[in-house]
From Swiss-Prot:
Gene: glmp
Compartment(s) of residence: Lysosome membrane
Lineage of the organism: Eukaryota, Metazoa, Chordata, Craniata, Vertebrata
Principal cellular location given in the protein's record: membrane
Gene Ontology terms describing biological process: protein localization to lysosome; protein stabilization
Identification of the protein by name: Glycosylated lysosomal membrane protein
Amino acid sequence: MYTIHFYVLFVLLTVRCSSSFIGNGENYRRNLSLELNPGLNSSLMPLPPGVGLLHVRALGKNNTLHYLLCSQGAPALLLVHTNSTSSKVKVDWPAFLVQNTTGSLKLTPESSVLYSNTLVFTRLWEYDDVNDTAVPEHLPPSSFFQPYELQNFTWDDLNKTLDPMAYTALLCGRDASESFSNGSLCLKFSAFDVEGRDQGWPSLLHNANSSQLRVVLDGVVPRSNRSRFSLELQVVGGTQSMSRVDVLRSIDDEYTPSIFKVSQWVSSPVNSTSPVLGYAQWKPVAYRRPSPVFEDATPCRHSTPVPIAQLPPSGLVLAYYGGESQTTGLNMTFSITGDPFYNTTNYLSWTVLVGLGSPPVDSFSPLVLVIMAVGLGTPMLIILLGGVCVCVRKNRPQPQVYEPIN
């Protein structure tokens, strides 16, 4: 009886400890506020079509995160961490709209800035995968179509898709070509005030120090029957830009079925054991339908990050950093050999998390830990009960078979 009680207590403690471990970020919460085009008087200075600047302020106990999503030029997401709870964004709008003026966007006080990085979406590559290899770097230049330069896209008004209650916004853009006559490339931005996960795959774990971008290529007419796509990304930072991609492995695919890896494009001091300063994190999977099932998943892979000599064509980058910042870039390639081509569904989505500090780490859910505890604990319980029974039987006094004669 005591053994059974001990086993039940063990399972309950396991569930309690696992829940506390998994939810250790839930106690940290930021207060979020959103504003569109901060400091702009639209009646005096109307914005050009397709230009917008979304500012999300994430206030902590003694610091502030600032997210700025901008559609001027190539779409970009700027993350700035300050050690002040009163830091503010200041935009010199006449200079900002010129696109060639450095310092037209600032965080004040400037001395409060601890870290910053900008993720820029620069190009969408399309190639004719005649031999079904899904390895564009091994294809001749003739297999590639003219890339879509995202700086030339016409972007929708962010004000129409802004959701202040959910802290989300949808930025959709189109090329002037016929391929985008009924299609679009969209970036769904989400900011988070506390730890949690998205309901839909890939269900990335986020916390109060992170934001998320979901890239969706929908309804675009491919230029060949065997077209596949790659997305070019660039990162601009101060003294510590994102220079390497770490790939971590796991034995658990509970939240993203069949995916046992996570990739992290991280920023850390050179030749230092210091923790990660910032990151872009994703799972190597994309989906071919808006509400995917298991068969709609397709793997994706990244190239090795390389330094780039010039800044990306983003108005936000030049306005904040000027011309003296480190830039690295990589390509994200979707699909593998044997997978359906883009024209099968004319849909592709991929999700990336952008945040401060070390990336969130997946761990087993309480349900999985209970199953493991029961699966491993039941054999132990049987062994313990068997041992107890054997000991009891051995210690029980045995009746004498032969009675001596007096």
